[in-house]
């Protein structure tokens, strides 16, 4: 496993607040997730980095208020799971990213 030589800034504190980061490695790709807070709303962000390049970055949550996301790389798939509050209920959701495609949000 390579040692990371330099710190990298992944979010812009003037644009959004970020907490509860997660990281998973798959080959040379680095997958990240974090809880983003913008305009009084928490959402789940996911990102793929290759070296200094941002391959993609997007919101992957289901519209509710997100809490404590986790991430796992296994068998060529990247799995994200999180708690989400919507319509006066908490639920646990999951979503898979594999071969450049996103699966549906699972409950």
Give residue spans per PLM region:
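Extracellular, repeat-based ectodomains that mediate carbohydrate processing or recognition
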Residues: 1-107
């Amino acid at each position: 496993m390579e040692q990371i030589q330099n710190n990298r800034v992944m979010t812009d504190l003037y644009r959004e607040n970020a907490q509860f980061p997660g990281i998973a490695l798959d080959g040379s790709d680095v997958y990240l997730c974090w809880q983003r807070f913008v305009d009084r709303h928490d959402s789940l962000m996911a990102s793929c980095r290759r070296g200094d390049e941002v391959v993609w970055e997007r919101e992957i949550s289901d519209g509710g208020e997100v809490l404590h996301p986790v991430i796992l790389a296994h068998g060529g798939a990247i799995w994200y799971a999180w708690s989400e509050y919507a319509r006066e209920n908490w639920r646990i959701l999951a979503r898979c990213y594999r071969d450049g495609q996103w699966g549906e949000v699972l409950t």
